[in-house]
Amino acid sequence: MSKRDFYEVLGVSRDASERDIKKAYKRLAMKFHPDRNQGDDTAAEKFKEVKVAYEILTDAQKRSAYDQYGHAAFEQGGMGGGGFGGGGADFGDIFGDVFGDIFGGGRRGGQQRAQRGSDLRYNMELTLEEAGRGCDKEIEVPTLVSCDPCEGTGAKKGTSSTTCSTCHGQGQVQMRQGFFAVQQACPTCHGKGKIIKDPCNSCHGEGRVHKTKTLNVKIPSGVDTGDRIRLSGEGEAGEHGAPAGDLYVQVHVKEHNIFERDGNNLYCEVPVSFTMAALGGEVEVPTLDGRVSLKVPLETQTGRMFRMRGKGVKGVRTHSAGDLIVKLIVETPVKLTKRQKELLQEFQESFDGKDAKKHNPKSEGFLSGVKNFFDDLTK
């Protein structure tokens, strides 16, 4: 089966700069990385192919040889006796150089370090009251914790791991590939450099066991949907004493039946009777801290907005509270008695006459506008 062109594998031109090659490699390595495609053999093969292409094209000598001889430069017997001499070149491990600690750090030229524990995510649903005021929440998180009997070493108590005889503790072995020496993880110790001959009975040599942890999470006031709270070191335990990962609490705030939230401001609608709207008065308004009184001015129209400063949500960083915006909705009375209807009719008749306009300015203005509109149409 023929091998694909390395430039084609990375999707770059033959005159691509090293920066362009690194950029393409980052994108493809993240796409096909085994951690993201567990159980997908095709993705694993593509990841290997991408990695080899990157190793060749980012080394000036190897790239020059590839441009001149193609894949033959790296096959046994390729290029005859020419090339780079008998010393060969060490591929090392370029993965850590490119991604740093994104995938747990590099391992160039030495023993593979025990891997840091994985980060975990916990989805937490909060009420608006909890998010607005802040609260303490107790959560249970299934995770991997350090094994107590062996203290995370993986070896039975009273014993210890021994140096791998295959790689002599280096965690890597050297393989010949054409004219080059390629460093690979030791197949005996899987890159750790140590062998556990007498594994712990509790964790079977893993150094970690499954457990459900109970944690208390302090929720600061002002959090909102999409916010994350980081609990350092509360993720999965690391391998054989390596640092633990972190736990990220993902916040989702439930919809409220009274308030709508926009940043640190709250909005609500408060119904008032038409008599209160006309004559003025006071109405109780709900807030996150309890009920407060709002003064309704004379002749208030429906939809009028009132700002109650400091009655919103406290900011996570600023700690200053937003405002509560109250929209008054004037209610039309329903299920009237005969007497109430008579009184309203008398009330309506009292508006008739030359003073009607001043009692209903918006209605009169609207009717006047409608009349002018139709007059213009008939011209």
From Swiss-Prot:
It is found in: Cytoplasm. Pfam families: DnaJ (PF00226), DnaJ_C (PF01556), DnaJ_CXXCXGXG (PF00684). SUPFAM superfamilies: Chaperone J-domain, DnaJ/Hsp40 cysteine-rich domain, HSP40/DnaJ peptide-binding domain. Gene3D superfamilies: DnaJ domain (1.10.287.110), Heat shock protein DnaJ, cysteine-rich domain (2.10.230.10), Urease metallochaperone UreE, N-terminal domain (2.60.260.20). Its cofactor is Zn(2+). The gene is dnaJ. PROSITE patterns: DNAJ_1 (PS00636), DNAJ_2 (PS50076), ZF_CR (PS51188). The keyword Zinc-finger applies. The keyword Transmembrane helix does not apply. CXXCXGXG motif repeats lie at residues 147-154, 164-171, 186-193, 200-207. It comes from the Bacteria. Keywords: Chaperone, Cytoplasm, DNA replication, Metal-binding, Repeat, Stress response, Zinc, Zinc-finger. This is Chaperone protein DnaJ.
